[in-house]
Structures are given as structure tokens and as C-alpha cells.
């Protein structure tokens, strides 16, 4: 079945008040109430600003809706602690950290924002769908499967797109069109040719007048030709967990296992392997994400070790955030179980920073639990890094066989 990308554009930023509790949203999703004092405008700033679905929090932070480009215009309707509440549609709000935005006192809200013409084309790495926009308006992206589908919501825009210029034969995109679903929601569809999600990104050009939906070309379906990134978790002043029996820090173990994986991949003929760190150095999550964005691997494998306050909890596990990348994590988990480890599970919608990028398939491997005596003994065995590396490599081979 053909894959499908869906892009949803939602019309008109709607605002409420900046009091402790949100007011009832404005009734119109098309015309902004430009005379109301109950909102103010901000623009995103800094590295990797993101919106969250709500005010919840845990050790991984709140549930992320999407990362945003810089300079994106948002309409603040309320404030809660360290977050602003922004209106995306008459019924959908998002939360963003106050430190991720700067006040915009110059821009005036328009009564409506209209999309212009589109153009599709390809270069040597990506298919592009470029939408003419009147402003840097917010968006979010999600993946779907069966059929594969990408959904991107653009908020604050109504269609005035009267032609879509399609230049040449695209490598990944079969067709693209749109439908105005309701006031405040424009849905853009993109049929895909590939059977696997290989990654996408959404960003504005330097003028803010073009929104580029960029679909990554599938690489060669051969392990030797893949560009694989390997991330050794923690490092430097971030020691991670430690075992109760041997006391070895997670940051040391992740580097040992990552090096073993690099060696195994090169032994299998993989020509390009990128390591986020090779020494005991401190790297923040944003630094790793930006490093990987610049490097643009075909896939990312991140190595960690689990821990629990209950020492009977045990097993190996793999994690993903985006459903389109789940197949990679499933086959690797199946191979990891062959090591005699119990299965802790295949965990989805995981809010780990390196599971967040949409530009490339990624898999977080939690080898086993340092807090469990049996798992820790397995982890510390001198042959285990090599065995784990082999199973991960075999999982990659299995995954490539799934691709049509």
C-alpha cells in the first residue's frame, strides 16, 4: 500500500487571557480579535525550542508536542509557572517554556493568514514540498503507519493555495494535495513511495515566507552502505546509574558498549560510523541533537543501561518515540532477547531527548538493569559488549530485510 503524508494547517492563532485560569476561547477560528488586550505575541528563540501538550512533568520533562524553528510567532493567552500557554486553534492549546521565547511588540495580529502556492522538487538527498506562507506560524508533526503517514499541523493559516507546481519525478513523494477540513484546519496530503519512514523535517527559509517540508530519500538497503550514528549515553559530569555489586558507572559502560558496536559494524563492512563521543566528556542533549542534525546519519543507535529502585526488576528493552520508527526497535529487541535476558519491553512514545528527532530512524537500547544482580553480572561479563553489539547488528540486518 502506498504511504501517505498528511499535513494539517490550522487557521488563525486564537488567544485567551494571561490570568491563572484560561478564559473561554474566542468563538471565531478565522478572524483574530485584534482589539482584545488579553494576549501578547512572542517568538521562539534559542536552540531547539519546543511546545508541550500540557503542564505535566517527570524526570524526562513534559510530554513534547513538537520542536519548533526559531522566530515562530506564538500568541500567549495565559501563564503557568515557568510556562506560557499559547493558543493554536479555538480548542487546542500548548505550553512553552518562557525561556524559549522573546516578546514581540512590533508585529500586529492580522484578521487572517492565507497560504499561497506550493512547489515540489527534489535534490540529491530530499524531496521538498514548499508552501508559501505569510508569517512564521507554528506547526507540529506526527507519524502514522499502515499506511505510513506523516501528519503536520500548521496553525494559523487558511488555504488560498490555487496551484501546486510539481517539478519532475520525485523519489519519495507520489502525489500531494490539500483539503480544508474546517475553519482552522487545512490538511495537506502527501502519498509516499517508500515502505519505511526514513525521516523528515519542517522548517522556514530565512525570509519566513516559505515552509519547507523535507522528506528524506531512502538510503541504499544494504548494511555496508548505511551511515550509522552511535551514541554512548551520559558522560563527563553525567555519570548515570551504577551497579550495586560492581559499582561501575553507566557512563563508563555505555562507552565500552558503544565502542564494541562501532567495531562490530565496521567488521560487518559498514563504512561510515559516527560516534557522538569517544571519551569521557560532558555533552548535553541539545548538543548531541545539533551534532546529529549536522551529521545527518541514516540511523541512530543510543546505548544506555536501566535502573530501578526495586532490584527484582530486570530485562532488556528498546525505546522509540515516533511510531514510524518502531520497526527498528522491535527487531533489535527480538535479537537482544536471544542473549538470555528477560524482556522488559518495547516502549513507545518515550520522551527521551534522542528519541525526539524526526530526521532519521532511531532506537534507544537499554541493555539491562544495573540495579538487578543477575543483569549486572551479565553486563559486567567481559564478553557481553561483543555479544550485545552482534545482536544489535543482526537486528539492523533484520530491519533492512523488512524494507520493500
Feature-to-residue mapping (PLM):
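Active-site histidine-acidic residue metal-binding/catalytic motifs
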Residues: 210-291, 295-299, 307-308, 325
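Active-site-adjacent substrate-binding region
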Residues: 325-349
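Active-site-adjacent mobile loop/cap segments within catalytic or ligand-binding domains
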Residues: 295, 300-309, 319-320, 348-404
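Short linear recognition/processing motifs and adjacent strand/loop elements at protein termini
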Residues: 19-229, 249, 253, 263, ...
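Solvent-exposed, polar/charged alpha-helical surfaces in well-ordered, non-transmembrane soluble domains
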Residues: 66, 72, 251-259, 263, ...
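Positively charged n-region of N-terminal signal peptides that target proteins for export
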Residues: 1-4
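Structural recognition of the beta-strand scaffold that forms the well-ordered cores
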Residues: 152, 227-231, 272-276, 299-303, ...
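Bacterial N-terminal signal peptides
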Residues: 6-15
